[in-house]
């Protein structure tokens, strides 16, 4: 197969992994599946801070060709490169299954999954609201890991400027490094399409930014929807609902909210069933007594998991199965 990129303009150059940038005009000449592969691999190189030599070893080609691939002037067998990236991507997915911590499918996960599916399938925005530490972010990242589609996840920087937010989104899309602010908007729009889902987490951080900054960020998010047709999920705490969507910016954001296919508001606490599922995953099978259950009902997901991990450590030291007694001992120790 001839290289479809050799005639594309080469306008970006970089010499190290922390400057990975793609020539989006070149990627436009690829098929959708091929384009997604290259964008994914560029993101892996950037995220892991691999040198070109290291990136080449990962997929089995000479490191000197990595820059040529990303810039669009690789003159070798392009089909061979794409197949190597496919193989590497599959291998990475299998390794993640072996090394990642067990994920517990709670009701939070189910509602997050449904929200993301609706946004992606219908190519529409959705709003996800929930208290801090309930497990939203963990579930969103798990959705990204499991998805067969290209899912991009970005956290809004606290109190950041429009430029900060643009580069955070560009970085999540794998197109942020080595590009100036004037071109980053176009890069973002080129990196997203109807097959992708963009997840914007911590949107409530805009409440810490200047009002006009928040408006400009939301207007750019609307521009992404209009120009790319991607699915979109915006996620945040109650501040998102109370201060952005219903507060002083309500008039600005009304059009955005009207376009949303769904607004999902998560429960403020874990259900007893969810608590039981998480506990069982960490080796505690029996039901808690009344006093322990009262404590459990005050906890959110992140704290529950950390206490169960501490309980497991205590149990291993005693060479015993983990019980609720170990859990309460851990709870007492950290609350002295």
What are these regions (language model features)?
Residues 2-71, 76-80, 268, 272-336:
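C-terminal alpha-helical "lid" subdomain
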Residues 79-96:
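DNA major-groove recognition helix of helix-turn-helix/homeodomain DNA-binding modules
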Residues 103-120:
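Pre-Walker A adenine-sensing motif
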Residues 121-142:
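Walker A/P-loop nucleotide-binding motif
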Residues 127-132, 222-250:
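Sensor-1/coupling segment of RecA-like P-loop NTPase cores
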Residues 149-173, 191, 260:
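AAA+/P-loop NTPase substrate/partner-engagement loops
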Residues 149-151, 246-267:
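A short helix-turn-beta junction within AAA+ P-loop NTPase domains corresponding to the substrate/partner-engaging
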Residues 165, 176-231, 269-277, 291-308, ...:
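Mid-core helix/loop region of P-loop NTP-binding domains shared across ATPases and GTPases
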């Amino acid at each position: 197969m001839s290289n479809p990129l050799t005639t594309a303009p080469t306008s970006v150059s970089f010499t190290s992994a922390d400057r990975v940038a793609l020539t989006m005009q070149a990627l436009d000449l690829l098929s959708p599946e091929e384009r997604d592969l290259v964008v994914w691999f560029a993101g892996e190189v950037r995220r892991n801070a691999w040198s070109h030599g290291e990136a080449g070893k990962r997929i089995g080609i000479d490191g000197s060709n990595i820059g040529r691939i990303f810039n669009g002037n690789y003159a070798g067998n392009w089909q061979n490169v794409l197949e190597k990236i496919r193989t590497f991507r599959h291998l990475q997915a299998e390794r993640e299954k072996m090394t990642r911590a067990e994920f517990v499918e709670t009701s939070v996960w189910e509602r997050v999954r449904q929200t993301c599916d609706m946004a992606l399938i219908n190519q529409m925005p959705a709003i996800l609201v929930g208290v801090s530490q309930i497990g939203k972010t963990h579930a969103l990242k798990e959705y990204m890991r499991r998805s067969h589609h290209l899912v991009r996840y970005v956290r809004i920087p606290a109190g950041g400027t429009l430029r900060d937010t643009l580069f955070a989104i560009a970085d999540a899309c794998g197109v942020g490094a080595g590009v100036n602010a004037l071109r980053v908007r176009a890069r973002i729009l080129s990196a997203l399409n109807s097959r992708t889902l963009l997840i914007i987490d911590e949107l409530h951080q805009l409440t810490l930014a200047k009002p006009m900054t928040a408006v400009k960020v939301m207007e750019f998010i609307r521009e992404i929807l209009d120009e790319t047709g991607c699915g979109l999920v915006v996620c945040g705490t109650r501040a998102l609902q109370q201060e952005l969507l219903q507060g002083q910016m309500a008039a600005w954001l009304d059009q955005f909210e009207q376009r949303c296919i769904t607004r999902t508001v998560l429960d403020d606490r874990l259900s007893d069933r969810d608590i039981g599922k998480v506990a069982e995953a960490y080796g505690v099978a029996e039901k808690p007594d009344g006093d322990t259950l009262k404590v459990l009902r005050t906890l959110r997901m992140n704290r529950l998991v950390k206490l169960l991990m501490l309980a497991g450590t205590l149990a291993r030291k005693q060479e015993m199965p983990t019980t609720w007694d170990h859990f309460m001992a851990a709870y007492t120790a950290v609350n002295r």
